[in-house]
Swiss-Prot record:
One of its GO terms (molecular function) is ubiquitin-protein transferase activity. Residues 675-686, 761-773 have a biased composition (Low complexity). It is found in: Early endosome; Cytoplasm; Nucleus. Expressed predominantly in late development stages and adult brain. The keyword Glycosyltransferase does not apply. InterPro entries: MAGE, MAGE_WH1, MAGE_WH2, MHD_dom. This is MAGE-like protein 2. Residues 1-51, 114-208, 406-431, 673-717, 747-792, 839-860, 913-964, 986-1051, 1261-1284 are annotated as: Disordered. Residues 39-48, 139-150, 158-203 have a biased composition (Pro residues). PANTHER family: MAGE-LIKE PROTEIN 2 (PTHR11736:SF66), MELANOMA-ASSOCIATED ANTIGEN MAGE ANTIGEN (PTHR11736). Disruption phenotype: Deficient mice show reduced embryonic viability, neonatal growth retardation, excessive weight gain after weaning, and increased adiposity with altered metabolism, including increased fasting insulin and elevated cholesterol, in adulthood. Mutant mice also show abnormalities in the circadian pattern of feeding behavior. Deficient mice show features similar to those of Prader-Willi syndrome in humans. Keywords: Biological rhythms, Cytoplasm, Endosome, Nucleus, Repressor, Transcription, Transcription regulation, Ubl conjugation pathway.
């Protein structure tokens, strides 16, 4: 060891006497002798213990260090061993001089002579690596003072730790390890006080290999180890399977090659234990390949070296110097090399794949990643038990090594930095300091919230700033847990501003210099900024985890800070610039509403010159010339009554036009005008209606009341003048119905006849059937004295109503008679006969479009503002509608009706009306009605005259054949026969497009329904038509009776009309409607009759639009509107959705159907991706496709999106929704697929049979319902099904 002591700066203790025998160093990797020319001899199994004479390092060795600033000496690369079994270059012959280690930090372990006492390392934390016999478990030394566990079959003596005697010195001439030349970077020595031991003098310790000498490796696994062959003889290489790589943050890997198979391994003794050493090796050690590499080679000898189980020789354990990296296991068959590697654990590429061993988690200080997932166990038949046990011991001993490495790093910064500045500038010491900091950070972080709640917040920022990377692992907090002020401050920050302001605020956490001001600056910012910004989640999410307690405590102690940082809150410039919101010019410029010039030009109304000039009334020339009245040939020839058969069979006669005429006057003049002016005024009304949606009462009732007094005053006189044209009530005699000209056939005789299914309220009360006029159940049950008169105010609302979906369906029922009606309009002269009895207008049906009363004074009468884009109304003057059967009807009724006339109550009463009511009802005392049952019945006027809602006037003929154009439009309402759910008239308010039905007119309180048109004679009922496309219309075939007063809409019907509008608006957004929503928004105070109102609205929807209200959820009572007309063709889907969306929906529904009505979300998205549609990307057609499928279609109830139970992470599946089942069927889906694939549906046999079974089932149910409904109509009209 004198060579070691002669090195520069050698501070080792003085050499001790060493035995003279076995002077050659023990080389763990043997090279053949120089004089040997024999072929390679297989190695015998290595000795029982790879106990290299690793003497403890007792003091720093400056000889291993190079002067500061000097580059290391050039290092020759070690020749890489070839593949398994390939010949390998041998080491130089035995006895050759060993070159000085060119690379600093190389630990060469040599074997001492057998039986020589070894200096035992007194420092804990040394990893002893001993080869073992194949099959013998590998033993590892326990910590100091721990009793040893022996492997099976091995006896171990544990003598007390005597002072370790020095090992014998090498024989003369033995090449020893020389220190590197000056300037070679060496390992750092530990600071003073480090319990590291140096080898005693003369200890044959580590010898570096000769420069460029190749390393000798053992043979492959399972092959007997060859003896050291002659120099230059190829030797087999050992694959070295089962490499354990214990990685540390500091670069430096110890790769230890396991021994040859069959070599028994004896567990090393505890500290200072005596152990038998193997025979000395005479093979010189090759030069290490690189700096800082420890090469531990198994000993090789000419004969098998077998270690005794128990030995009295002390074993010398090596203690790595402070700068020495920790040990790992070398992969493949490479020499036992301690390489300075990166922190990446590299898996051995050539080791065959074997069952994965459990990961060995080394108990290391924080920051030392020691898992070895790539450690392949038991390759090539190597016993798994020794390796597994060995891993356990390594795991147990690793903490000691880490603990040893931590202290020197903290204590020796100055020495390490001065000696190894060129090579190791210092990241390793910094990394060694991190573990204690990490241990301290956690308690600081735990204490941070309470400290922030209190005033001193200083410890928190240091913990946050010193370890920012730990925050990255924490998940973002839920946004709903933020403080109230956070939610209040966020809306004022624009979305784009939040993203831009998050990074600077989030980075405040990383500034440790901010001191105690950091929490005061950062926390308020987190209150307002990083929470809603998803882009900053990667950075701000970790920092936000600990913020909820801070946020909740911020208002207490740090309220001014959010006030100091409301800059993003004070920068809601986009919100302060809601110019589009502040410039609702279209809302403030309802010029069409403010320019109801006909309404704003009531100058003729204010100039009641026509009223003051009752010249037309004083010119009863038409009354004196009652040529039409004296020509009641239609009345005297009750052709409609005598021709019921062809009308009932619907297809007997083609009709010429029948003019339903009412006096047409300008909306603001009570004077006769020319036909051209009337057309212009009608056009203006139509334009205003299109521009002005129905927002309540477009025109005040007071403006219209100015028109009424004169006519009301003239009522009694006019009635006296026309006794011959007044008709008796329908129940008092044969009612002269709509009479056609003698030469004209019935106009609408060929209207198709609708179904006779009765309508029933959800409560079980009957609605009117197709052929039976019925009043509401309440009205039928109510006595006559409970019925009230009409309200005092009345106005007409002309509205253009276009059916959005029922139009196409109803066009199919348009008779040719209407198509042939001429469009010529004539002006009816405003003579006294224009208003023969009163100024009341009673539409032919009480079911004309009756929204909320336009002239009502309380908001309750308008529960819902009818803002449907399809309905517009216009206030029109009150004029009576009287059907006018004339030969010119065909020339006057060609125009398609486009204005819906709405009649409200009128404050009118006459003696004739009172007399008419007396004929069927007991007299009632005059005055206001005292009944308070929610105004469900007509009210009684001041005169005490009360009219039932069933009492209507019959149509009255007029002498003057001229008529206006909008009375022709009104004719459509008169042709309808569908009555409301509570009135016996033909059509409901919405002009139900029911196919032809038998007309129902006046029904007396005590007469049978079959006499309502024909009187007591029991003659056949007269006819009525019902359908015109895209127009809602009322109806009445009843001839207007001058002795009876018109009645207002029932409040239930008003609410039903408003509910229809509400449902249509909701259906445009495809949003299901709940019963509670309908009650709260529309029905309101009539909630006791909510089911009745809903049933009426359902009937109106079905008759007018071909839709039906369906309940899709019985628990929440959720309803949707389903199109019945387009069921087999599934046209509703295409009409509602845009074409691309409809196609996507059909593809999704088809795939779900083919997969058994259920498909996983990921499978669906992968299928769409194969079609070229990425659901994650934003496209121009669907925006975000995933959101369209999983949100929009689900909200529309086309799809059902639910989580698959017991899935982690959560997975979802898609199914058909209730709307899909209602609007389409399996047959249609199969046809869609067949058209898509250009095949027949029969190729999918299973789905095809399933679809046929569903179709047959539905047909059977439909037939059963038809038969049941026919029985109900014949016997019990109250059994219509609930609209489910």
């Amino acid at each position: 060891m004198s060579q070691l002591s002669t090195n520069l700066g050698d501070s080792s203790p003085p050499e001790s006497p060493v035995p003279a025998v076995h002077s050659r160093p023990t080389v763990l990797m043997r090279a053949p002798p120089a004089s040997s020319r024999a072929p390679p001899v297989p190695w015998d199994p290595p000795p029982v213990d790879l106990q290299a004479p690793m003497a403890a390092w007792q003091a720093p060795q400056p000889a291993w260090e190079a002067p500061e600033g000097q580059l290391p000496a050039p290092v020759a690369q070690l020749a890489q061993p070839p593949g398994l079994g390939a010949p390998m270059v041998q080491a130089p012959p035995l006895g050759g001089g060993m070159a000085k280690p060119p690379t600093p930090g190389v630990l060469m372990v040599h074997q001492p002579p057998p039986g020589a006492p070894m200096a035992q390392s007194s420092t804990p934390g040394v990893l002893m690596l001993h080869p073992s016999v194949t099959g013998a478990p590998l033993a590892h030394p326990p910590p100091p003072g721990t009793p040893m566990t022996h492997p099976p079959g091995t006896s171990m003596a544990h003598p007390p730790p005597p002072p370790p005697p020095p090992p014998p010195p090498p024989p003369p001439g033995t090449p020893m390890t020389h220190p590197p030349p000056p300037g070679t970077p060496m390992g750092h020595h530990p600071p003073p006080g480090n319990p590291m031991t140096h080898p005693p003098p003369g200890n044959p310790m580590v010898h570096p290999l000769t420069h460029g000498a190749p390393m000798v490796h053992g043979g492959p696994h399972g092959t007997p180890m060859p003896h050291v062959p002659i120099t230059g003889t190829p030797i087999a290489q050992q694959p070295t399977p089962g490499v354990l790589m214990a990685q540390q943050l500091t670069p430096g890997v110890l790769m230890v090659q396991p021994p040859a198979p069959g070599a028994p391994m004896v567990q090393p003794p505890p500290q200072a234990a005596l152990m038998t050493q193997p025979a000395p090796s005479i093979t010189p050690m090759a030069k290490p390949p690189g700096p800082g590499v420890v090469m531990i080679h198994p000993p090789g000898a000419r004969g098998p070296i077998i270690q005794t189980p128990v030995s009295g020789a002390p074993m010398a354990q090596t203690v790595l110097p402070p700068g020495q990296p920790l040990a790992t296991w070398a992969p493949q068959g490479q020499p036992l090399i301690l390489q300075i590697q990166s922190q990446v654990i590299r898996a051995p590429p050539q080791v065959p794949s074997v069952p994965q061993a459990p990961q060995v988690q080394l108990a290391t200080p924080p920051g030392w990643q020691a898992t070895t997932p790539n450690w392949q166990v038991t390759p090539q038949g190597w016993p798994a038990t020794p390796l597994t046990w060995q891993a356990t011991q390594v795991t147990w001993q690793a903490p000691t090594i880490a603990w040893q490495a931590t202290q020197p790093g903290r204590q020796g910064h100055s020495t390490i930095r001065t000696g190894h500045t060129p090579i190791r500038p210092g990241p390793a010491p910094l990394l060694r300091q991190i573990p204690p900091m990490i241990r301290q950070i956690q308690p600081v972080m735990r204490q941070a919230p309470p400290l922030i709640r209190q005033v001193p917040i200083r410890p928190a920022p240091h913990g946050i700033a010193s370890q920012p990377q730990l925050w990255q692992v924490l998940p973002p907090p839920p946004p709903l847990r933020q403080a109230p002020q956070a939610r209040l401050l966020l809306p004022r920050v624009p979305g784009t501003g939040q993203v831009s302001t998050v990074p600077p605020v989030a980075q405040i956490h990383l500034v440790p210099q901010s001191g105690p001001q950091v929490p005061q600056t950062v926390l308020p910012a987190q209150l307002s900024i990083p929470i809603p910004v998803p882009q900053a989640a990667a950075q701000s999410a970790p920092r936000t985890v600990h913020c909820p307690p801070i946020i909740w405590q911020a208002p207490k102690g740090q309220a001014p800070v959010p006030q100091e940082l409301p800059v993003p809150q004070e920068l809601p410039v986009p919100q302060e610039l809601p110019v589009p919101q502040e410039v609702p010019v279209p809302q403030e410029i309802p010029v069409p509403q403010e320019i109801p010039v006909p309404q704003e030009l009531p100058v003729p109304q204010e100039l009641p010159v026509p009223q003051e000039l009752p010249v037309p009334q004083e010119l009863p020339v038409p009354q004196e010339l009652p040529v039409p009245q004296e020509l009641p040939v239609p009345q005297e020839l009750p052709v409609p009554q005598e021709l019921p058969v062809p009308l009932e069979f619907q297809e007997v006669q083609q009709a010429q036009a029948v003019g339903w005429r009412a006096p047409k006057v300008p909306p603001h003049f009570w004077q006769p005008v020319s036909a051209q002016e009337a057309q212009e005024q009608a056009t203006q009304i139509a334009h205003v209606e299109q521009q002005q949606p129905f927002q309540g009462a477009p025109a005040s009732s007071k403006a219209l009341q100015t028109q009424l007094p004169t006519h009301q005053a003239q009522a009694s006189g006019l009635q006296a003048e026309l006794p011959s044209v007044q008709l008796q009530p329908s129940w008092q005699g044969p009612l002269p119905m709509l009479q056609a000209q003698p030469g004209a056939s019935a106009t609408l005789a060929n209207f198709p006849r609708g179904s006779t299914r009765s309508r029933m309220a959800p409560s079980g009360e009957p609605g009117p059937s197709s052929l039976e006029p019925r009043g509401p159940p309440r009205e039928r049950r109510a006595p006559a004295r409970d019925k009230k008169g009409p309200p005092k105010e009345r106005m007409f609302i002309g509205a253009t109503f276009c059916a959005p979906r029922g139009a196409s369906a109803s066009r199919a029922y348009v008779p040719t008679a209407w198509k042939n009606l001429p469009a010529t309009s004539e002006t009816f002269p405003a003579t006294s006969r224009v208003f023969p009895s009163t100024s009341h207008f009673q539409p032919a049906s009480s079911n004309a479009f009756r929204g909320p009363s336009a002239a009502s004074e309380s908001p309750k009468s308008l529960p819902f503002a009818l803002q449907d884009p399809y309905a517009c109304v216009e206030a029109l003057p009150a004029v009576p509608w009287v059907p006018y059967p004339d030969g010119n009807a065909s020339s006057a009724c060609k125009s398609v009706p486009a204005i819906l006339m709405v009649a409200a109550a009128a404050p009118q009463a006459s003696a004739t009306a009172a007399e008419a009511s007396k004929s069927s009802e007991p007299p009632r005392r005059p005055g206001k009605a005292t009944r308070k049952k929610k105004h469900l019945e007509p009210k009684e006027d001041n005169c005490g005259h009360r009219l039932s809602s069933r009492d209507w006037r019959g149509p009255r003929t007029w002498g003057n054949p001229s008529h206006s154009d909008w009375e022709i439009q009104r004719a459509m309402q008169l042709l309808g026969d569908r009555e409301s759910l509570y009135t016996p008239q033909g059509l409901n308010d919405w002009g139900c497009p029911n196919t032809s039905r038998m007309p129902r007119s006046l029904e007396g309180p005590s007469t049978s329904r079959d006499q309502e048109f024909c009187g007591d004679s029991g003659g056949s009922q007269t006819w009525m038509a019902s359908e015109v496309p895209s127009v809602s219309r009322g109806s009445s075939a009843a001839q207007e009776d001058p002795d009876r007063e018109s009645q207002p809409l029932s409040p239930l019907d008003e609410r039903a009309n408003a509910l229809v509008q509400f449902l249509l608006v909701k259906d445009q957004a495809k949003v299901p409607v709940q019963l509670s929503e309908m009650v709260n928004v529309v029905i309101r105070e009539y909630k006791d009759d909510s089911l009745d109102i809903i049933n009426r609205a359902n009937t109106k929807l079905e008759c007018t639009f071909g839709c039906q209200l369906k309940e899709v959820d019985t628990k929440t009572h959720t309803y949707i509107i389903v199109n019945k007309m387009a069921y087999p063709q599934c046209n509703l889907l295409a009409s509602y959705l845009e074409r691309p969306k409809f196609s996507l929906l059909m593809v999704v529904l088809s795939l779900i159907f083919m997969k058994g009505y259920c498909i996983r979300e990921n499978l669906l998205f992968s299928f769409l991706f194969q079609l070229g549609l990425d659901v994650q990307e934003t496209s121009g057609l669907f925006r975000i496709t995933k959101k369209l499928i999983t949100s929009v279609f689900v909200r529309h109830r086309y799809l059902e999106y639910r989580q698959i139970p017991f899935t982690e992470p959560a997975e979802y599946e898609l199914l058909w929704g209730p709307r899909a089942f209602l609007e389409t069927n399996r047959v249609h889906i199969l046809r869609f697929l067949a058209a898509l694939y250009e095949n027949q549906p029969q190729i999918w046999s299973c789905q095809y049979l399933d679809s046929l079974a569903e179709l047959e089932y539905k047909d059977a149910n439909a037939a059963a319902e038809e038969s049941h409904d026919s029985d109900d109509d014949a016997h019990d009209p109250t059994s219509s099904p609930h609209p489910h």
